[in-house]
C-alpha cells in the first residue's frame, strides 16, 4: 500500500 494511505489511517486512528 502507499505510504500516504498508511499515514492517513494513522491520523484517523
Curated annotation (Swiss-Prot):
Protein name: Temporin-1La
Function field: Antibacterial activity against Gram-positive bacterium S.aureus.
Secreted recorded as keyword: yes
Subcellular location: Secreted
Taxonomic classification: Eukaryota, Metazoa, Chordata, Craniata, Vertebrata
Tissue expression per record: Expressed by the skin glands.
Domain of life, per lineage: Eukaryota
One GO term (biological process): defense response to bacterium
Family: Belongs to the frog skin active peptide (FSAP) family. Temporin subfamily.
UniProt keyword annotations, A-Z: Amidation, Amphibian defense peptide, Antibiotic, Antimicrobial, Secreted
GO cellular component: extracellular region
Positions bearing Leucine amide: 13
